[in-house]
Amino acid sequence: MATRFKGLYNKSFKCFSDIFDVEEEEEMEIGYPTDVRHVSHIGWDSSSSSAPSWLHEFKTSNNVLEPNSSWPFQDLKSAMEAFGEVESSKEMERESTKQNLKKKLSSKASLLCNSWSPRFSRSSKVLA
């Protein structure tokens, strides 16, 4: 029985130590040629055959800033115009709000200055 216990004891510790046995991964050393390609380099290499097919729809010419370019600046322009319209409508709303406030204040001021107004008569009685 002691030999059985000893065998079980040794086997369990052998398996238990295997849990903590960490295999080290191979480290990639910088400078050696690898198969890794960075996404930012695709399409900018000298060979265009290595570029993916979806990249061919983008032009790499110098006429990007020209108005006839196929670059999507038209979308940007329309977005900026829409933003300008929103800003102008906000400005118009602010102006109308200011005008409404002026009307309200002028009507309240006229009520305060009106001698037939109940406020004016009450305040004059209190002061007199």
Curated annotation (Swiss-Prot):
It is a peripheral membrane protein. Expressed in roots, leaves, stems, flowers, siliques and pollen. Residues 87-97 have a biased composition (Basic and acidic residues). Interacts with ARAC11/ROP1. Over-expression of RIC9 in tobacco germinating pollen reduces pollen tube elongation. It is found in: Cell membrane. Functions as a downstream effector of Rho-related GTP binding proteins of the 'Rho of Plants' (ROPs) family. Participates in the propagation of ROP GTPase signals in specific cellular responses. Is involved in pollen tube growth regulation through its interaction with ARAC11/ROP1. Residues 84-107 are annotated as: Disordered. This is CRIB domain-containing protein RIC9. GO terms for cellular component: plasma membrane. Residues 30-43 form the CRIB domain. Keywords: Cell membrane, Growth regulation, Membrane. Signal peptide: none annotated. Pfam families: PBD. InterPro entries: CRIB_dom (IPR000095), CRIB_dom_sf (IPR036936).
